[in-house]
Structures are given as structure tokens and as C-alpha cells.
Amino acid sequence: RDAVWVRDITLNNSTWGNRTFPVYTPRDSVFALGAAIGLGVAHGIGAAIGATNRKVVCMCGDGGFFMGFADFWTAKQEGADVVFLVMNDGGYGVIKHIQDTFHEGRHFFADFTNPTLEGCAKLAQMPYWKVEDTADFQRQVQAALNVNGPALVEVDMKKIGPFPRYFVPPKADSQFVRN
């Protein structure tokens, strides 16, 4: 009840992130309604600076997190009281699901190699935790919430398992295709 919940556009967020955290007032929730990926880090920092005396939890996928990576350093510089909860599946999960449906599993521009999140946290001298099992999730996130200032929690989605394909529309039926 005392935190602000910030979400980037991510497969993990939309499958359960929007449904897990109770939102009591309009200022408890920050979300990019235009479905633009990569705004979460900046929104998390802005919320942390604007919401004095309240913790901010910012949920991002690894794709969106690295799109806003330049802002990550600002969190450290400004001492923003934000926990970055990064759901790491090694690529753009929703794009992979769409490509699986429409391109018979051929992936292009959906997988990437980034620096390790642990290494990024170390460079920023920011506390870091890694969740590799759902049984550890609450304990790891609680430890990050106890930090005064920015902290990073990586959730290894490859070890936890894939999410259902909620976003993918069906293939166009022949009744909709014009000759």
C-alpha cells in the first residue's frame, strides 16, 4: 500500500504484473498506455523522485530495461528509491511469440546478447539479487525493498519457465484475405 507500481511494456508484466499489485489510488500506478517499450526505467526514476517517502517498484523486461539503460545511471546518481524488477528472458518475448505464430518459429531481431545485469549493478555500485526459482521471489524482492535507494532484482525467466502466449492474435483466416 505504501509503494508505487511502475510497469514497462513486457510480456511478463501483462500476463501477471498488472494483476498482482493492488492499486488503491491513481498515483499508485504508472504504466505506458501507448504500449511503447523502454519507458519503464525513466518512469520508475521519475516516480521515485516525485513520490517522496514512498518506495517505487519498477517492473521491466530485459528488452525494455536495456532500451532505457542510459537512465539506469540516473537512478544511482539521484539516489532514486526504486527497485528495478527485471524479467530476463534474453530477448523480446512478445516478439518471439508473434514470430512463432506468423513466421513458423523463425526469429529475427528478437534475441539479443546484453551485458549481465549483475555486471551492470556492480558497475553502478547498486545492490543486486537474482531470482532463479519462484520460491525465492518474495525473499529476494523483500531484501531489495529494504534498501534505501536504487536496487536491481533480476528474475531469470529461462529458469522459471515460459509464459503463456496471451498477446498473439490468430493468423488471418482466408475469409479476411482478399485476392
Predicted feature locations:
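A short acidic, glycine-rich active-site loop
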Residues: 30-36, 104-112, 179
